[in-house]
Amino acid sequence: MLYIDKATILKFDLEMLKKHRRAIQFIAVLLFIVGLLCISFPFVSGDILSTVVGALLICSGIALIVGLFSNRSHNFWPVLSGFLVAVAYLLIGYFFIRAPELGIFAIAAFIAGLFCVAGVIRLMSWYRQRSMKGSWLQLVIGVLDIVIAWIFLGATPMVSVTLVSTLVGIELIFSAASLFSFASLFVKQQ
């Protein structure tokens, strides 16, 4: 999700943003449409999402290998470990493209892990700050995060694909809304 506050906006050149206002709005419309498509067609968008993530993993693996050999030092172990990570990226990316169903399940497991970690962190935060006013919200959000992680992990394959596609669709729609509000800050003056 895009997070843009006043401090970020002040760092941008105002004239440059006014020139690119239409492009920002166009990207926002595309994000909104893709978000709606992800929610409307979860299985097709799940396959596409897995393929895109696989392609990005392959590009990352290639970039890591190129970076290793162009910037290598005389230390053997960092180069070897970086090469092994690059090979892992390439293999995982290949499997994401070759078997999109497995890729989307891996994405679902990763998202479940993120929710679980976030839930544990929120619960720890609540426990440390339980005497403070309003700390109960940390408890509620932490429990909800763990419940969402459990739903992701315990879901059937069809539900898992639907959950991931819906989550990505909602995220894209919120990013589109954020870009629309960002673009509306820079109205062209006649």
From Swiss-Prot:
* Cytoplasmic side of membrane: 1-25, 71-76, 127-138, 188-190
**Membrane topology (UniProt):** Multi-pass membrane protein
List the GO biological process terms: response to pH
Give me the Periplasmic side stretches, as residue ranges: 45-47, 100-103, 162-164
Q: Which GO terms describe its cellular component?
A: plasma membrane
Q: State the source organism's domain of life.
A: Bacteria
Which residue windows are transmembrane per the record?
A: 26-44, 48-70, 77-99, 104-126, 139-161, 165-187
Q: Which Pfam families match?
A: DUF308 (PF03729)
Per UniProt, which keywords does this protein have?
Cell inner membrane, Cell membrane, Membrane, Transmembrane, Transmembrane helix
Q: Where in the cell is it found?
A: Cell inner membrane
Q: What is this protein called?
A: Protein HdeD
* Lineage, top ranks: Bacteria, Pseudomonadati, Pseudomonadota, Gammaproteobacteria, Enterobacterales
